[in-house]
Amino acid sequence: EKTNFEQMGLAPPITQTMTTYVLGDDLYDESFSIDTQAGEFMGEYGVGVSEAIGVGEPKKVTALEIWLFDKNDIKTATKVLMSQHAFNDPGIRARLEPKGELVLVEPQSQVLLETATLQLLATVVDLEYGRGPLPSDSYFERITLELAIWPRQG
């Protein structure tokens, strides 16, 4: 169920979507357009697989990347959502740091991305770790994110 931001005293977002990664969706890569009510293109946002661990099928995804592209900003904002294991692993951290700010994923946690004229609030709605021979809390069985976009105030 989508968050009613107006009940929280916030302006309604320009766009709001839910997306779920499930173990086995090796090609998970979602992107969405941001348009004004008049249909003017403002940018895009999305989420996709950033890093997997272990070997074999399906991929054991240990980190996802959330990004926000603003047509008025030369730089795309990116944050990397990491499993507990990945967040505490110096080798994985070193590989992923060039992609963007590293964030530990926790249920109900929120991550804010900002560009010149847009902001994206990502909320971890649901998080379930895979169980298996790999370290505990190392890869996602499923993760549901709510992504909401507003004009940036300022």
Stretch-by-stretch model annotation:
Residues 1-154:
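Surface-exposed, beta-sheet-biased, low-hydrophobicity segments with strongly acidic/polar composition
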